[in-house]
């Protein structure tokens, strides 16, 4: 069904980040029609993630201003460009910052969920076709972000960056499967491949850390140790599968030694869900000699480096990283939505606040106060 706006420029509301650390403002933005291989999506719900804040803060070397941030969302296809066959107007979709073209060296390798097709464009805030933005305000271009830009009532994405999902799924909930929840679950299931009976340590009990706990519980982990400097998070974490808690502030010894002592030599798997390089070292060094695996999930600030003694690795520990939990976006996000509909994974429980796009600055404040897991913004109000 063709929409009445197909082929036309749409003027809509979007939250524009004009410069680093300056509050975003709601603006009337012109969104151009999709070109070949592109999809224009009406965003209905978008959540906030720490990655959005990281770029907005000015610490991201790839951060470009002015831009429209946002990458965890859900909506409905408004129109498609030439050659787009996998989605059509009216389809319910989740935009995916991790593309999946199924044709590049990465996609064909069978070894990774990374995709090389559009990264050269999305990394600099433009679309592949003409290396230009589809967003503008009175003729002035506004950069895209992560190939998604979901803090807008309409966005344009590459067709390799959009997953068609079951229309029965509530978009205000499954939008979370566009980043945080999927990342945590996949870190356990795909990257670490945690087995039943394993002892797991999770550093950082935000949305991603709690999703790691949920994944570890479903994998049959025998002990799931949550580590956070905010003890208020511990009650909530129990609901996601965490069995015991450690606050590093309560101990004089280095946290890795505390965990090693608690676990008869170390954990089988650890997950760093903060993005702090010193914590990444602790997470590795609390792993058991001979077989312990540590997965870096959190994104550290640009230019920071990790370090440990080589002996840690020589004696059998493994250090790994994960992006989007190792999930192939277009193929597996629809599968995750089905798991949610079958009540096999939690999603609703991560949504602690619901607001409107116009409240975006207040929502970012909440994210930083620590009492908020995911705040979902409705764009149509």
UniProtKB/Swiss-Prot annotation:
Swiss-Prot/TrEMBL cofactor(s): Zn(2+)
Top-level EC class: oxidoreductase
Annotated GO MF terms: alcohol dehydrogenase (NAD+) activity; S-(hydroxymethyl)glutathione dehydrogenase (NAD+) activity; S-(hydroxymethyl)glutathione dehydrogenase (NADP+) activity; S-(hydroxymethyl)glutathione dehydrogenase [NAD(P)+] activity; S-nitrosoglutathione reductase (NADH) activity; zinc ion binding
Binding residues for Zn(2+) 2: 101, 104, 107, 115
InterPro entries: ADH-like_C (IPR013149), ADH-like_N (IPR013154), ADH_3 (IPR014183), ADH_Zn_CS (IPR002328), GroES-like_sf (IPR011032), NAD(P)-bd_dom_sf (IPR036291)
Cleavable signal peptide: none
Localization annotation: Cytoplasm
Pfam families, A to Z: ADH_N, ADH_zinc_N
Protein name: Alcohol dehydrogenase class-3
Species of origin: Oryza sativa subsp. japonica (Rice)
